[in-house]
Every structure is written in C-alpha cells, then in structure tokens.
C-alpha cells in the first residue's frame, strides 16, 4: 500500500526523512493520498532529534486514526480524503 512506509537516510552530518513509495498519477489531484508515510517520517525525524515523546504521540495518533477507520483514505478502506485524514490525526494529538 502506498503511503505507509517512512524512510530515513542518516549520515554523520545530515539526515533526510521521507515517504518511501513511488508516484501515484492515478490519484493526482483527487485529494485521496494517504499522508501516513510522510507523518511517520516526521516521527522518525523527531526521534532522531531526541524528541521521542513527541514522536510517540504522533505515532499513537496515526494508529488511533487508522483503527477508528472513519476518516481514513480509500487505500485503507475509508471514505475520507487527505485533509480529513490529516485533520483526524491532528485532533488526536
């Protein structure tokens, strides 16, 4: 499933955090992209920056939102759009 895998490239002097997936031209402009991979990459970044407590809060909010299922994107079986999914995660923070 696109949109679930975070990625990190960590070197001695720099670190880059990103979503790990290809493009999805079939959903371009439809506002149904799953934001989880990018948010999970942000959680990895927070951990890297010694903010593990904040990273855990974000991961928990994402997991709770997926479990609730009411505003997830169609790729996760929901009927929500990207904004609704992200808003639901923010509300749980």
Q: Model-derived features: where do they sit?
A:
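Short, amphipathic C-terminal "tail helix"
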Residues: 73-93
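Glycine-rich phosphate/nucleotide-binding loop
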Residues: 1-57, 61-70
């Amino acid at each position: 499933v696109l949109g679930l895998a975070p990625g990190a490239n960590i070197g001695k002097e720099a670190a880059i955090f990103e979503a790990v997936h290809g493009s999805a031209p079939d959903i371009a402009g439809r506002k149904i992209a799953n934001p989880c991979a990018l948010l999970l990459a942000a959680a990895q970044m927070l951990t890297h920056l010694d903010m593990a407590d904040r990273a855990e809060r974000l991961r928990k909010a994402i997991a709770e939102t997926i479990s609730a299922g009411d505003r997830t994107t169609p790729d996760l079986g929901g009927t929500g759009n990207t904004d609704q999914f992200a808003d639901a995660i923010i509300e749980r923070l």
